[in-house]
A protein has these predicted regions:
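Nucleic-acid endonuclease domains
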Residues: 2-8, 12-162
Length: 162
């Protein structure tokens, strides 16, 4: 968004709790200076009722708080491993132990960013990441909080269990 109608980059996310899903881990790892806007909602039947908006001002000096010792190259090797797992349930099951060991080896337990590999029984092979609102606040990252009231028609997600 930076350069179009804004002098800043923004990442806009929604959550119905404390956890903020941040998408692709390598893309997020490259970003060091942006405003993270989080809309918090309550699911009321087929509507999401947004009640709180947080804006966290993520800056380069927060890199060690967010990522700890998880550098881009280390994460890229892990992502490459995950993406090259063959499609299907057999490969999903056969690689489970190794995936866990590798994830534990690269994870920095002191970092706010958490790693979430997505390997299903079909062909999904990607690595995402997340943060928690309360941990961002506790870490002292500058933020603004606003009470809002917006309702969006948006039924709960339905997952295909086949």
């Amino acid at each position: 968004m930076k350069g179009l109608l804004s002098i800043s980059d923004y990442s806009i996310k929604t959550t119905n709790g404390n956890k903020i899903d941040c998408g692709d881990i390598l893309r997020r790892r490259q970003e060091t200076d942006y405003n993270l806007v989080v809309g918090v909602y309550a699911q009321c039947e087929d509507n999401k009722v947004f009640h709180t908006e947080y804006t966290f001002y993520i800056r380069p000096e927060h890199e060690s708080i967010l990522w700890g010792k998880m550098n881009y190259n280390l994460l890229a090797e892990y992502v490459d491993y995950i993406k090259n797992i063959p499609a299907g349930k057999q490969a999903q099951q056969e690689t489970k132990a190794k995936r866990t060991v590798l994830k534990n080896c690269i994870t920095d337990k002191n970092a706010l960013i958490k790693i979430h590999p997505k390997v299903d029984s079909k062909k999904q092979r990607r690595v995402q990441c997340s943060l928690k609102i309360k941990q961002l606040i506790k870490a002292g990252i500058d933020y603004k909080v606003t009470t809002i009231r917006e309702t969006v028609h948006s039924p709960k997600r339905k997952f295909n269990c086949n």
